[in-house]
Amino acid sequence: MKIVADQNIPALSDLLSGAGTLSYFSERIPPQKLLAEADALLVRSVTQVDEVLLEQAPELKFVASATIGTEHINLQALEERGIGFAHAPGANAQSVGEYVLCAVLNWLSDQPRYVADEIDVAIVGAGHTGKAAGKRLEALGLNVHYYDPPLCKKGVKFVHDHWQRVLTADIISCHVPLTRDGDFPTQHLFENTALQSLHSQQLLINASRGAVIDNNALLERVEQGERPSLVLDVWENEPEVLSGLVPYVDIATPHIAGHSLEGKVGGAVMISNALLEHFGKPADKTLSDVLPGKAWNERDAGGLNSLESLNLWAKEHYDLFRDDELFRQQGLTTEGFDSLRRNYRKESPRREFINQVVTCHNSEQYIQFLQLGFSARLLSK
């Protein structure tokens, strides 16, 4: 079996050892020579698997994407050709949740005074990443609600479909797939009218897909002044970035919210097992089989009993502003944007907060830090 894979999907040589011949590609589109003989193709969201690509891959039997989204895959074309498909929903959810947590901690630290349960948070999209973000913000004591009309239509109880409630929230965090049709399209969900309604006391976060927010309309809005605080990890038309928008964004990053080591390796494990299963081979690899050991670091909860101390500790383990600085320096060209994603923290991979242990003195602390995504240890009395 000949397997063609994006070179930035980690651990494949270990996960697929003995499964076949593994060849890598480094650009967005695999070389025609590799496609011509490929039995399986493993991609990231930067590769468009469309009719043009599939015409070059007559032997292809299986495609997988190491991502949660599928908008870069022509699923109908795969089905018509009898080509199997898999992706990795939820693999990077904890990583995205931590990105949002760090962004919100930073924003809250700049608020002169606030009462936690009076901060209204709208999570737009109640899938894996939305729930991971929401759980962490609930652990801060914030008032979190979930906007998800498709789930609401199905009768799911913990979501709502009140758009105005979203637009009036103090914090809005986007976690939806990019859809262009159907009953609830998300492309330009935040268009001119919605963006004009936002004000300077709000925080808008997008860690889903760039085109969920109309970037040109957003630029028009922020140029008017009294803008909301902005955290953008994704950009419409990326790797091209609307450069005029960047100076108005408080935290700007190159689509790396989900790029923790655990998130990337987790996606690789999911699609590798799916590939092996598709071809009738044993598929029993786990994250612990290929992930480096945890970098344990212990901290007493008593030293984390304020927002300031928690924010500072979170920054020690994931400093958003390091990624923001590199993006502003290098990410405003298509080549620079792709390079930042491709080479993201290669020398010192970003590890998730679960590697950090918080020693807790009561059950309330224990539950809170587990919800925040840390490991926790409850001292016995």
Curated annotation (Swiss-Prot):
Residues engaged in binding substrate: 45, 67
Pathway this chain belongs to: Cofactor biosynthesis; pyridoxine 5'-phosphate biosynthesis; pyridoxine 5'-phosphate from D-erythrose 4-phosphate: step 2/5
GO molecular function, one term: NAD binding
Keyword entries, A-Z: Cytoplasm, NAD, Oxidoreductase, Pyridoxine biosynthesis
Binding site for NAD(+): 148, 207-209, 233, 258
Gene Ontology annotations for the cellular component aspect, listed alphabetically: cytoplasm
EC number annotated for this UniProt entry: 1.1.1.290
Keyword set includes Oxidoreductase: yes
Database matches in Pfam families: 2-Hacid_dh, 2-Hacid_dh_C, DUF3410
Principal location: cytoplasm
Example GO BP: pyridoxine biosynthetic process
Highest rank taxon of the organism: Bacteria
Subcellular localization: Cytoplasm
Annotated catalytic residues: 209, 238, 255
Catalytic activity: 4-phospho-D-erythronate + NAD(+) = (R)-3-hydroxy-2-oxo-4-phosphooxybutanoate + NADH + H(+)
Family: Belongs to the D-isomer specific 2-hydroxyacid dehydrogenase family. PdxB subfamily.
Subunit and interaction comment: Homodimer.
Function, as annotated: Catalyzes the oxidation of erythronate-4-phosphate to 3-hydroxy-2-oxo-4-phosphonooxybutanoate.
Official protein name in the record: Erythronate-4-phosphate dehydrogenase
Gene: pdxB
